[in-house]
């Protein structure tokens, strides 16, 4: 994958527009989770160190396009950046017809989704973005799967279009895990439905040596193997699909599970052998014996890809399976990459972020890359690099 990299460019005195993913949860005007902003900071600092006039843009939430809405304003992000960078970061609402930014200064543009034509990737808007800068830097892996004005269109028209350090690191890490992984490779794919992760499962079945499934996905695989899953969430219409995937790759199944009679924070958890699951049981986690077996598998792996908690870890009594596997990944010498919102929440909960080789900032983009799909915002950077 050949793209121009911001790190290789001379940016002194250049006007540089950086597309970041600053789409963070905001409540009462305060940033609730700053992971994405923190991930972007090294890129912004580097651009300033290189002597650029820095303009930063992002979306936040899903406002009605073309209309300002206070709840989707990037004002709380501008305030956060001001503190983090130790300098005033002005938030500019009116920027499409040109702005004055001096070398060594940094400004944040208001939510790109307030601009008509952003989501449709309209040429007219993309050309306006491109006219603002000498260099466009795409650094938002989390939105790379969307061809929009500020992720794709601007890269078509800008004088120079490059990948930022964060995007480049994502592509390198995913390439290392998927293109030529050190073996054996294990993948953990968990979630409520096989249908939403079918392409991921099929893609990984052709790459990895062990495919560990969890959540509702595991229940469908259990049903496919002839086990009773009680009133657990599973997809009867995808049992044959699960059988076909299990014929292509080793899918170790739980030998014991944690069940409850209801899905609730106060639900009583009971450990049962898989053969003992009753008709009114809901499987909400893998059992301790299964967790130990899966942890052993992970210990011998050289590459681990993790997407999704294996149980309802938000409720502590159904979180032991996820905690055990999270710690096994953290303790492993393997190259480990983790992605997806729930996965990041589990990593936070169990305090293992420092011990995962690479944590992807992208949710949908992470999954689409794993599926083998082309990410439009990356593809255009490759095309521009060819000249």
Curated annotation (Swiss-Prot):
SUPFAM superfamilies: Phosphoglycerate kinase. Keywords: ATP-binding, Cytoplasm, Glycolysis, Kinase, Nucleotide-binding, Transferase. Gene3D superfamilies: Phosphoglycerate kinase, N-terminal domain. It is an enzyme of class 2 (transferase). The keyword Cytoplasm applies. It is found in: Cytoplasm. Its EC number is 2.7.2.3. Monomer. This is Phosphoglycerate kinase. The gene is pgk.
């Amino acid at each position: 994958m050949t793209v121009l990299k911001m790190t290789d460019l001379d940016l002194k005195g250049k006007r540089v527009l950086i597309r970041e993913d600053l789409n963070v949860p905001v409540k009462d005007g305060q940033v609730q989770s700053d992971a994405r902003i923190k991930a972007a900071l090294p890129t912004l600092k580097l651009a300033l160190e290189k002597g650029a006039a820095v303009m930063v843009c992002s979306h936040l939430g899903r406002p009605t396009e073309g209309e300002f809405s206070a709840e989707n304003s990037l004002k709380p992000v501008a305030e956060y950046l001001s503190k983090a960078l130790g300098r005033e970061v002005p938030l500019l609402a009116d920027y499409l017809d040109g702005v004055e930014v001096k070398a060594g200064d940094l400004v944040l543009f208001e939510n790109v989704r307030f601009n008509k034509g952003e989501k449709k990737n309209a040429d007219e808007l993309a050309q306006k973005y491109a006219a603002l800068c000498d260099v466009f830097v795409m650094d938002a892996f989390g939105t790379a799967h969307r061809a929009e004005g500020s992720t794709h269109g601007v890269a078509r028209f800008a004088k120079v279009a490059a990948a930022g350090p964060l995007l480049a690191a994502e592509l390198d890490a995913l390439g290392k895990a998927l293109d030529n992984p050190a073996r054996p490779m294990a993948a953990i794919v968990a979630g409520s439905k096989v249908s939403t992760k079918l392409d991921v499962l099929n893609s990984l079945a052709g790459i990895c040596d062990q495919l560990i499934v969890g959540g509702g996905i595991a229940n469908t695989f259990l049903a496919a193997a002839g086990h009773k899953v009680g009133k657990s969430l599973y997809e009867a219409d995808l049992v044959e699909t699960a059988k076909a995937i299990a014929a292509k790759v080793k899918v170790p199944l739980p030998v014991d599970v944690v069940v409850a009679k209801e899905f609730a924070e106060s639900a009583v958890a009971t450990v049962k052998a898989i053969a003992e699951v009753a008709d009114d049981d809901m499987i909400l986690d893998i059992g301790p014996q299964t967790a130990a077996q899966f942890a052993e598998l992970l210990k011998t792996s050289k590459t681990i890809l993790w997407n999704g908690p294996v149980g309802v870890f938000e409720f502590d009594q159904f979180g032991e399976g996820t905690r055990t596997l999270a710690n096994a990944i953290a303790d492993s010498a393997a190259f480990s990459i983790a992605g997806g919102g729930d996965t990041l929440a589990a990593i936070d909960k169990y305090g293992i972020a420092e011990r995962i080789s690479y944590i992807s900032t992208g949710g949908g983009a992470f999954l689409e890359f794993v599926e083998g799909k082309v990410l439009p915002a990356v593809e255009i950077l490759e095309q521009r690099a060819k000249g």
